[in-house]
């Protein structure tokens, strides 16, 4: 079988497990899209704009482990770069592929459309290098296989996005055939000496410490170490807490799990348990202003074992080339029981999170009642995509059955991320019950991608909280800029359905102003398997979780610190 640059790329994407790639057409990528379509083992999924295309791919990567997005040059790629920055921050291997001008024009110094009006066309590649783990431009078919393999292998190894630029007159040119897929997955093993030393130093560090706690961080999935973390926790016997962005990365029904560790907004008893611990073994954590509640919840470095995806720092010694999965597996085989932290937590009798009792069905709808009814929908096969804002805190409060997942974008924190991410996730995992929790302000940024849920008949259940503004910004710093124009959100579903058109959809838009109306709307949503259901939930502007208020004040205080005289 003969290959072109485009079909080579398609085959490599299929070989790494992709069944879909996301795309927005533009004249510099049309021939490439044609070539990708020739591979019948992968479907081309279309998005409404390039920002959404990037976020859709990011959501797909959460479900499938990797993703690809195809856009046009400059006017497309520069929009997608926002989402690629998010994929970098969230440790997700998204392959961004951009069409590019004909290399004859590039060589001749012609001024072209969709560009800056200059004759240097390297600027997009140079920009991409700052937000990806690898970036390559293909100007000849001979160099295509090596460059394609390089970026894909880098994405899979580093769990970071990569960038590939293909000149429009190169996509259909013949090139070499792809070899075995195994070459793309090869990764350097842990250095045995460094691994053994890290394990022995850790055992020595905790030998005389009984109250040992485990803190699960948001890079645990990227490290491929979720199962290893459970085995280690079971062997250790200590308390296990998750950082906010790592919710669902450790099974909440595990007997060692004590809840979310998030400073002042932690689960009851968790903050005190973590502070009283003799040692904290942090697994792939991210300590930023959000995760530390405005820098108020940072572990004591004298008690900390910092286990990153590829290195371990313990007792002031850094052990490189140690894979987290290998480290935890080896520790689980050698560690002695250390139950002190879990015993201490139990002695506090801190109780469970206070949950709202069922509301009067005729009473005006409130935030707590929405969260209660959403939590009742959770099964081991459910994924909740929680938008930046109070949806974070509502999802944090939910008790997850084993197998349920929650997805956040807490490092990048781009409002509007959740809508295309939920679309992409549902494309990648259509067998799951996919729930989207999003506020009205965030929804307005990326609402168009609901139309693609309609197009592909994806039964995503969307809980849209209509409280007339950016609530998370209100809690951090209020002003008139946090007020938004109200929409008829439920009414949008008729727009997206395009009733009467050649591809009329089956999306449903419903409104809920009471708990009873919400319960009835959920029944309709569960019965609608032919498209998304958007439930517009009306609540008061000041109605939010107590946790958001506390957290917002801490983050606001961190933002308002006096300036320093010197930057790093």
From Swiss-Prot:
Segments passing through the bilayer: none
GO cellular component: cytosol
Region called Thiamine pyrophosphate binding, residue ranges: 390-472
Binding site for thiamine diphosphate: 50
Catalysed reaction, written as an equation: a 2-oxocarboxylate + H(+) = an aldehyde + CO2
Molecular function GO terms recorded: magnesium ion binding; pyruvate decarboxylase activity; thiamine pyrophosphate binding
Cofactor: Mg(2+); thiamine diphosphate
UniProt enzyme class: lyase
Protein residues bound to substrate: 27, 114, 473
Keyword annotations of the record: Decarboxylase, Lyase, Magnesium, Metal-binding, Thiamine pyrophosphate
Annotated positions binding Mg(2+): 440, 467, 469
Cofactor note (record): Binds 1 Mg(2+) per subunit. Binds 1 thiamine pyrophosphate per subunit.
Subunit structure, as described in the record: Homotetramer.
PANTHER family: PYRUVATE DECARBOXYLASE, PYRUVATE DECARBOXYLASE C186.09-RELATED
Official protein name in the record: Pyruvate decarboxylase
